[in-house]
Amino acid sequence: MSLIGKLFGTGGKGAKGPSPQEAIQKLRDTEEMLTKKQEFLEKKIEQELVTAKKHGTKNKRAALQALKRKKRYEKQLAQIDGTLSTIEFQREALENANTNTEVLKNMGFAAKAMKAAHDNMDIEKVDELMQDIADQQELAQEISDAISKPVGFGEDFDEDELMAELEELEQEELDKNLLEVQGPETVPLPNVPAAVLPAKPVKKKQEEDDDDMRELENWATA
């Protein structure tokens, strides 16, 4: 039996090792125990420091003993710090290994499931099925085109004649609109001789002024 086996009570060829989850839990428990030990030592160090300051020069022997205990506690604390770092590293490595194991296990399970799903599949049958689907889609499209195509029912007209008639109607409508824009046709008036009319006799300015004065006098004496 190995030294590690003697320490942890394990050994023998038939002994089964702990599972990753069990080992991780053990490491966490150990971390918790060492953390509590750290807190205890930190308190003891503070107490011994207070004791050393308390005695000081009054009782050098007691002060020196307190400082010695403080040094021992500090040494133990440093050892625990190193042990905790090692345990944390081991736990993280074990957790990563356990995660990788679970991932690979699930990937293998998925691969088996995919293989089982493909066991009853034949690539040739898949190709035939896809070809059948394409043929049926093409047939459905042809049927839809045939249904949507208008049927004559005796209305077989010459497209050229219909277009010519339509153009004639459009031209008539265009001519009508042009006539409405131009307005009614103007009728020429008969010629009138260009004779000069006699001008109205113009009174002289003095005569007009005399007439105005007479009218004003008549109005004033009336």
From Swiss-Prot:
Subunit comment: Probable core component of the endosomal sorting required for transport complex III (ESCRT-III). ESCRT-III components are thought to multimerize to form a flat lattice on the perimeter membrane of the endosome.
Family that this chain belongs to: Belongs to the SNF7 family.
Gene: chmp4b
Stretches the record annotates as Disordered: 1-21, 183-222
Protein localization: Cytoplasm, Cytosol; Late endosome membrane; Midbody
Keyword Membrane: yes
Protein name: Charged multivesicular body protein 4b
Phylogenetic placement of the source organism: Eukaryota, Metazoa, Chordata, Craniata, Vertebrata
Originating organism: Xenopus tropicalis
One Pfam family in the UniProt entry: Snf7
Domain of life: Eukaryota
Record GO biological process: exit from mitosis; membrane fission; mitotic cytokinesis; nuclear membrane reassembly; protein transport; vacuolar transport
One Gene Ontology cellular component annotation held by this UniProt entry: nuclear envelope
Coiled-coil ranges from the UniProt annotation: 21-182
Protein task: Probable core component of the endosomal sorting required for transport complex III (ESCRT-III) which is involved in multivesicular bodies (MVBs) formation and sorting of endosomal cargo proteins into MVBs. MVBs contain intraluminal vesicles (ILVs) that are generated by invagination and scission from the limiting membrane of the endosome and mostly are delivered to lysosomes enabling degradation of membrane proteins, such as stimulated growth factor receptors, lysosomal enzymes and lipids.
Keywords: Coiled coil, Cytoplasm, Endosome, Membrane, Protein transport, Transport
Membrane topology annotation: Peripheral membrane protein
Gene3D superfamilies in the cross-refs: 6.10.250.1710, ESAT-6-like
Stretches with biased composition (Low complexity): 188-200
